[in-house]
Swiss-Prot record:
Native organism: Vibrio cholerae serotype O1 (strain ATCC 39315 / El Tor Inaba N16961)
The protein's assembly and partners: Binds ribosomal protein uS19.
Subcellular location: Cytoplasm
Protein name per its UniProtKB record: Ribosome maturation factor RimM
InterPro entries, per database record: PRC-brl_dom, PRC_barrel-like_sf, RimM, RimM_N, RimM_N_sf, Transl_B-barrel_sf
Phylogenetic placement of the source organism: Bacteria, Pseudomonadati, Pseudomonadota, Gammaproteobacteria, Vibrionales
Keyword Cytoplasm on entry: yes
Task of the protein: An accessory protein needed during the final step in the assembly of 30S ribosomal subunit, possibly for assembly of the head region. Essential for efficient processing of 16S rRNA. May be needed both before and after RbfA during the maturation of 16S rRNA. It has affinity for free ribosomal 30S subunits but not for 70S ribosomes.
GO MF annotation: an example: ribosome binding
Keywords, alphabetical: Chaperone, Cytoplasm, Ribosome biogenesis, rRNA processing
GO BP annotation list: maturation of SSU-rRNA
Length: 182
């Protein structure tokens, strides 16, 4: 099995899917995409596969639809046995390969770690996760240890103008119109 150019896992990568079991005898693998449009995972190249704490670069040689999913051929994997060794490994990409967004659009990963404060200056905590609910995205905010309202976590809808007043990338801060007791 030949991987290209290894790099330390600490280099930021964005996980976009997972490799499944091997398919056929020529080194193909099933792919499970985490992207909104599953086929868009193939828009990004190279892919990085986590191998023992290192990101190993692989180029996508080919891909095709198979039943209700996808299969992929990675460069350097030519036999089933080599492909089998990558079963259940995560697929990541370089975040720099993502399309640039307008000033008022955000990737979820940009919001993680941002401080959340009310319009009155009350510190609600830090964004630790995001949830997709269908109608709108929701910020998962871990409250400060000494939260005056005894909250450990808050779920705040990401509704621009209504709830989200300002997202300041520079200051790593989100200002919200939200009742701290809720």
């Amino acid at each position: 099995m030949k991987g290209k150019e290894t790099m330390s896992k600490q280099n930021e990568k964005l996980v976009v899917g997972k490799l499944g079991s091997s398919y056929g005898i020529r080194g193909w693998l099933k792919v499970f995409s985490y992207t909104d449009n599953p086929e868009s995972i193939f828009d990004y190249s190279p892919w990085y596969i986590d191998q023992k704490g290192e990101w190993v670069e692989y180029k996508v040689e080919g891909w095709k639809r198979h039943n209700k999913g996808w299969v992929v051929k990675l460069q350097g994997l030519d036999v089933r046995e080599d492909a089998h060794l990558l079963t259940n490994f995560e697929i990541a990409i370089d975040p720099a390969s993502l399309p640039e967004l307008s000033e008022d659009e955000f990737y979820w990963r940009e919001l993680f770690g941002m401080q959340v404060v009310t319009t009155n200056g009350y510190d609600l905590g830090v964004v630790t996760d995001m949830m997709e609910t269908g109608s709108n995205d929701v910020l998962v905010v871990k409250a400060n240890l000494k939260d005056a309202f005894g909250q450990k976590e808050r779920l705040i809808p990401f509704l621009e103008e209504q709830v989200i007043k300002v997202v300041d990338r520079q200051a790593q801060r989100i200002e919200v119109d939200w009742d701290p007791a809720f």
